[in-house]
Regions:
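Conserved alpha-helical segments that form or flank metal/cofactor-binding pockets of metalloenzymes
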Residues: 92-123
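Export/targeting segments at the very N-terminus of extracytoplasmic proteins
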Residues: 31-96, 120
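Second-shell loop/turn segments in exported
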Residues: 47-56, 72-75, 97-105, 139-150, ...
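Membrane-interface motif at the C-terminal end of an N-terminal transmembrane signal
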Residues: 16-29
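Short, functionally critical alpha-helical segments immediately adjacent to catalytic or ligand/cofactor-binding
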Residues: 77-96, 110-111, 154-157, 174-179, ...
Length: 218
């Protein structure tokens, strides 16, 4: 099967960015970049070694990670870094597909159902035949569907694509938007918000990326 690019445009104002807190309000995906900055910052971070159990769980997800990160997003046919998605999964859930936070975020990358519903509408509009995804889920999405590893990873790639486009591939700002929301990033003039949880997540994710970047996961 030849994988074609998903080309989507993005028209977004700063006001819309601030209103984005609860999910997609306007626009759609830009190209998902694998920025040199991400790799440079990863190399300078202390590598954080996952546990053996984490690595075993992550290994079972490889077909989904490799497939969804092989899809090209946007007019530049850019692709998401597989190591970024692996690191996001390790950071958010320790690769537990049925993880759930006290705030209701679910699945491997801890996605809020409200945000997922908006993304699902965007994905449904593409009429794209994704592998590993039952097309009926686009018509009748339920919060528990976020426990499906393939769907969770697809949504994570789509969301991350938008953030990478907005923040020119800055790992720190992409993670800040993921954790605290784009509105928080905007309130602090496109700087990392001074939230301990957000800054801790950035450190952990970059640590996992540094470990993965050493070629420790095939």
């Amino acid at each position: 099967m030849k994988i074609r690019a998903i080309s989507l445009g993005l028209a977004l104002t700063m006001a819309a960015l601030v209103r984005f807190e609860a999910g997609f309000e306007t626009g759609s995906v830009w190209g998902l970049l694998t920025p040199a900055e991400a790799h440079a910052s990863s190399e300078s971070a202390w590598a954080q070694r996952p546990s053996g159990d984490q690595l075993r769980r992550l290994a079972h997800l490889e077909p989904y990670i490799r497939y969804f990160t092989s899809l090209a997003y946007g007019p530049e046919d850019a692709r998401v870094s597989a190591d970024y998605i692996r690191a996001l999964i390790l950071t958010e859930s320790s690769a537990h597909a049925h993880a759930r936070s006290g705030k209701g975020a679910r699945g491997l990358t801890q996605i809020i159902p409200g945000t997922a519903r908006i993304v699902m509408k965007k994905l449904a509009a593409l009429s794209y035949d994704f592998l590993y995804i039952d097309e009926d889920v686009f018509k009748s999405f339920k919060p528990e569907d976020l426990y499906d590893p393939a769907l969770n990873i697809l949504i994570a790639c789509y969301l991350s694509a938008t953030y990478h486009g907005w923040y020119d591939g800055s790992t720190e700002l992409v993670v800040s938007a993921w954790n605290a929301g784009p509105g928080a990033v905007a309130r602090y003039d496109n700087e990392v918000p001074p939230y301990p949880e957000t800054r801790g997540m950035i450190t952990r994710l970059k640590g996992f990326m540094a470990y993965l970047g050493e070629g420790n996961v095939n």
